[in-house]
């Protein structure tokens, strides 16, 4: 379906700091994308790459938070890639944010031809597909966003390692019950791993993990105290509100 014919909605995120046009069906921008952007460290002049960017939620949130960061949104789905480009334009970020229709698992030559040479990124952020293929969504767009093979995570992290400069950092969000998969996939190229569990409320098991790792660094892993999205009554915590609506950064340093 063409971007012009796709049924979409215009949704404000970050307390209205961004307005995103996105399909009514399929994967939609939610807490995961905003948490991922908030946990990504970058500074003015850096080049960040958002792998599997969808309509650009995480990458655009990063660009909104940090002035001067250049962001490339990589997305395989043509409708979503077109929406990502349009969202950069409508939020007045197209001078620093561009969208590419490209498979994250494409070759180094394909990435270079698109202007993404090895070692060209200071940071990579990603929200990889995490549903096993035995349980795919019947919706095609949602299936592209969520369905994973046994090697998806490893392949995405290899792409990240190739794109990153020597001291570059990858940040990702993943299912909490898949943390072992993340650590195994990071082992080849990354170290100095920091893990932040994300809990829906006090006493509940983590539903997500935010993970940051540095290319070529072999420092030991750090497991941080969990981050709470809501209190026992279901009300968003002040920390969650500051990030999800206020656009603040989410520290993964343990401070």
What are these regions (language model features)?
Residues 1-14, 47, 110-118, 249-255:
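Short, low-complexity, intrinsically disordered N-terminal peptides in bacterial proteins
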Residues 2-43:
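Class I SAM-dependent transferase core
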Residues 19, 70, 96-98, 191-194:
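Conserved beta-strand segments of alpha/beta enzyme cores
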Residues 25, 150-206:
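Conserved Class I SAM-dependent methyltransferase catalytic core
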Residues 36, 156, 213:
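Residue-level signal for inorganic ion chemistry
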Residues 39-138:
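Conserved SAM/SAH cofactor-binding pocket of Class I
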Residues 128-155, 159-162:
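Mobile active-site "lid"/loop adjacent to the S-adenosyl-L-methionine
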Residues 205-255:
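SAM/dcSAM-binding transferase cores
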């Amino acid at each position: 379906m063409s971007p012009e014919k796709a049924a979409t909605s215009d949704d404000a995120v970050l307390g209205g700091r961004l307005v995103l046009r996105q399909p009514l069906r399929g994967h939609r921008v939610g807490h995961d994308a905003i948490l991922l952007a908030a946990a990504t460290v970058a500074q003015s002049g850096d080049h960040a790459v958002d792998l599997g960017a969808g309509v650009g939620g995480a990458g655009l949130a990063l660009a909104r938070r940090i002035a001067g960061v250049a962001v490339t949104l990589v997305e395989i789905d043509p409708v979503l890639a077109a929406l990502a480009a349009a969202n950069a334009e409508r939020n007045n970020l197209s001078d620093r944010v561009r969208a590419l229709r490209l498979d994250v698992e494409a070759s180094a030559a394909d990435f270079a031809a698109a202007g993404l040479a090895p070692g060209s990124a200071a940071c990579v952020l990603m929200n990889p597909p995490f549903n096993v293929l035995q349980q795919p969504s019947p919706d095609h767009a949602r299936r592209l966003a969520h369905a994973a093979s046994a090697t998806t995570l490893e392949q995405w992290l290899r792409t990240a390692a190739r794109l990153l400069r020597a001291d570059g950092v990858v940040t990702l969000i993943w299912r909490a019950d898949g943390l072992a998969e993340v650590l195994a996939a990071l082992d080849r190229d990354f170290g100095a791993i920091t893990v932040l569990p994300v809990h829906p409320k006090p006493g509940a098991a983590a539903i997500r993990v935010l993970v940051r790792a540095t290319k070529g660094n072999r420092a030991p892993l750090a497991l941080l105290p969990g981050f709470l999205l809501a209190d026992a009554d279901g009300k968003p915590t002040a920390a969650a509100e500051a990030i999800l609506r206020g656009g603040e950064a989410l520290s993964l340093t343990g401070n």
